[in-house]
């Protein structure tokens, strides 16, 4: 297990911060959080759609 972890650390050292942000999705306009319909429902911005009738 220690050998696996040290290999992971060595691999991460080769990746720059900007490349890591791209891989993890942190450099997108939504800051790594993908806006979904369920997220919007929790935030009540879609409430009028579901309660209009």
UniProtKB/Swiss-Prot annotation:
Q: Where is this cross-link: Lanthionine (Ser-Cys)?
A: 38-52, 45-53
Disulfide-bonded cysteine pairs: these are none
Q: How does activity depend on temperature?
A: Thermostable.
The reported result of mutating residue 35 to A is: Low activity, less than 10% of wild-type
Keywords, in A-Z order: Antibiotic, Antimicrobial, Bacteriocin, Lantibiotic, Thioether bond
Substitution effect: residue 33 to A: No loss of activity
Q: Which GO terms describe its biological process?
A: amino acid transport; defense response to Gram-negative bacterium; defense response to Gram-positive bacterium; killing of cells of another organism; regulation of membrane potential
Reproduce the UniProt comment on modification after translation. Maturation of lantibiotics involves the enzymatic conversion of Thr, and Ser into dehydrated AA and the formation of thioether bonds with cysteine. This is followed by membrane translocation and cleavage of the modified precursor.
Q: What is the effect of changing residue 15 to L?
A: Reduced protein production to about 50% of wild-type level
Outcome recorded upon mutating residue 20 to M: No loss of activity or protein production
Q: Does the UniProt entry include the keyword ATP-binding?
A: no
Q: Impact of altering residue 23 to D?
A: No mature protein is produced
> What is the activity's pH dependence per the UniProt entry?
Stable from pH 2.0 to 4.0. Activity decreases gradually with increasing pH.
Question: What domain of life does the UniProt record list for this protein's source?
Answer: Bacteria
Effect upon mutating residue 41 to A: Loss of activity
Entry GO MF terms: signaling receptor binding
Q: What is the effect of changing residue 14 to D?
A: No loss of activity or protein production
- Pfam families membership: L_biotic_typeA
Q: Where is this cross-link: Beta-methyllanthionine (Thr-Cys)?
A: 36-41
Family the UniProt entry places it in: Belongs to the type A lantibiotic family.
Instruction: Quote the function comment for this protein.
Output: Lanthionine-containing peptide antibiotic (lantibiotic) active on Gram-positive bacteria including M.luteus, S.aureus, Streptococcus, P.micros, P.acidilactici, C.sporogenes, C.diphtheriae, A.viscosus, G.vaginalis, P.acnes, L.monocytogenes and M.smegmatis, and Gram-negative bacteria including C.jejuni, H.pylori and N.gonorrhoeae. Transiently and partially depolarizes the transmembrane electrical potential and pH gradient of susceptible cells, inhibits the uptake of amino acids and depletes the intracellular ATP pool.
List the protein's name: Lantibiotic mutacin-2
């Amino acid at each position: 297990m220690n050998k696996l972890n040290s290999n992971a650390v060595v691999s991460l050292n080769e990746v720059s911060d900007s490349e890591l942000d791209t891989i993890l999705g942190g450099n997108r306009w939504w800051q790594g959080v993908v806006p979904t319909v369920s997220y919007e429902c929790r935030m009540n911005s879609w409430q009028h759609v579901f309660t209009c009738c």
